[in-house]
Amino acid sequence: MARKALKIKAEKEPKFSTRKYTRCKICGRSRAVYRDFGICRLCLRELAHKGSIPGLKKASW
């Protein structure tokens, strides 16, 4: 419930732009959010393994 409330709180436009922070669009996690995708590293990894994100694949060398 708390995470849901924080997601709603993050959607509101703050009075000052410096108070804005990124939050994952899928799970609501506030840390390690990739700006390009708008999702956290955990969700990004999961979606990449499923092949849901076009052009993104796991690196191997």
Curated annotation (Swiss-Prot):
Question: Cofactor: bound how, per the entry note?
Answer: Binds 1 zinc ion per subunit.
Q: Which UniProt keywords apply?
A: Metal-binding, Ribonucleoprotein, Ribosomal protein, RNA-binding, rRNA-binding, Zinc
Q: Which Gene3D superfamilies match?
A: 30s Ribosomal Protein S14, Chain N
Q: Name one GO molecular function term.
A: rRNA binding
Matching Pfam families, A to Z? Ribosomal_S14
Q: Which residues bind Zn(2+)?
A: C24, C27, C40, C43
Cofactor requirement:
Zn(2+)
GO BP annotations of the record are: translation
- Annotated family: Belongs to the universal ribosomal protein uS14 family. Zinc-binding uS14 subfamily.
Q: What is this protein called?
A: Small ribosomal subunit protein uS14
